[in-house]
Structures are given as C-alpha cells and as structure tokens.
Amino acid sequence: MLFAPVSKAEPSPMEQSYEGNPIVVINLTYEAGIGCGDDIRGDIVIELFLNWAPITVSNFVGLVNESFYDGIFFHRVIDDFVMQAGDPTCTAIGVYPASDPSCGSNGSDETIPFEADANLTHINGAVGMARGLDPDSASSQFYICDGSQHGLDNGNRSQEDDPGYAVFGVVREGMDLVQAAAQVPTSNDPLNRPLYEVHINSITLNGDVTPEIEETEEEETPSIGFSLSILSIGFVALLRRN
C-alpha cells in the first residue's frame, strides 16, 4: 500500500484541473425497456490524476489503450451512491441478469497496490478503484460516485485494517449522465444489477489538460488559465467485486 501526505503548496486536483493530467471519455448508452425510464446517451469526461495516483492511472490508461472496457456495461448501480463497471465478462445484450450470474466478480489479470493521497477524496463525481478485502486486489473494476461518499475515504473506515478506496480521477463533464444512469431500475437483490444495461460503448483517451490563452478587453497581453481541452492525440485504473 502506498500513502502520500497532504501537500499545502497547491490546491487539491479534485477542485482544480492541472496541466498534463490525462483526459478520458466514456461514451455510454442506456436503452430503457418498458417502464424502465428514459433512454440515456452521451459522453462522460474524466480527468485522471497522474501525479497523485501514478500506478492506478497508468493501469487504467493501459487498459483503455487496449480497449479493455469497450462493450461492457455497469453491472452495479446504486442511486445516491455509485455506479460500478470493469468486469470484462459483463457484455451480454438484453435483459440482465439473465446472462452469466458471475458477471461482476471478474477483472483483468493483474492487480495493483493500493494508493492513497490525502488530496484525493470521494466528492461527487469522484472515480475510484473497486477491490476485494485485500487493499492491493484492485485490477480493472472502477466506480463513479453519485454524490459525496466520504465514508469510502482513507481514514474514514470503521475497521483499522481497512484503508478505504483509491480515488484516481473525477468527472469534469457529464455528471447529468451519471445521475441519470444511477437512477435506472435495478434487480431486487444485493447486487443492484440494472434490469437493462448501462452500456459502455467505449472509453477513449483524448489528450490531456492544456493551458488556455484568454484575451481580455483591459489588457493586450494574454492571461493564462487552465481548462479541459479534449484533443485528438494519443497519451504516450463497500466496493467489492460482487
């Protein structure tokens, strides 16, 4: 397990974008069945915290570059908590869970050590790694917070040997899609499986955070601000697996 102290020299990346952080885009769709809400489609833009969670981000980016997540769906959805994905066996199309009942228990072949940085917390839209009882058992499953979930933070767990869950990114655009997807009807069992899939069409790496030049009326010289710039360039991962 790897831990990093709070840095007083700079604001938390949860609150401010930093130049060089990778940007990924989740393109998702939800085709609602009768009585199961409205269709959902669009992009969720996520900033990854490379300097604060380097092992976790590198693992996630590597899987994205392999198209690991393309074609799977969010197998666990809980309104006002999280939506979780990353099991490569969760690919069935149609009513779920009529497919493989083991969906939600699997991941990639390699696990990574737990990383914690006190600057990274479970605010609304935080992206973290799901894992088993072993803090170093995370592989490919991840979740997106629907609302603040600080009970998952390092230091806020009830058991002394539970370090919490590793945050490695945050949603910068598309929280309306997260909130809509978190409200889809689910099965009446502890697995909270959507009756119809919230489908990940693709997760793609779309450049990184770059400085933006802003012209002002008062000054002829430009000022430098930071914004999310999605570029078409290559950059060159309670929650337990069910």
Task: Annotate each predicted stretch with a short phrase.
Residues 1-11, 215-242:
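Secretory targeting signatures
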Residues 2-218:
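Cyclophilin-like peptidyl-prolyl cis-trans isomerases
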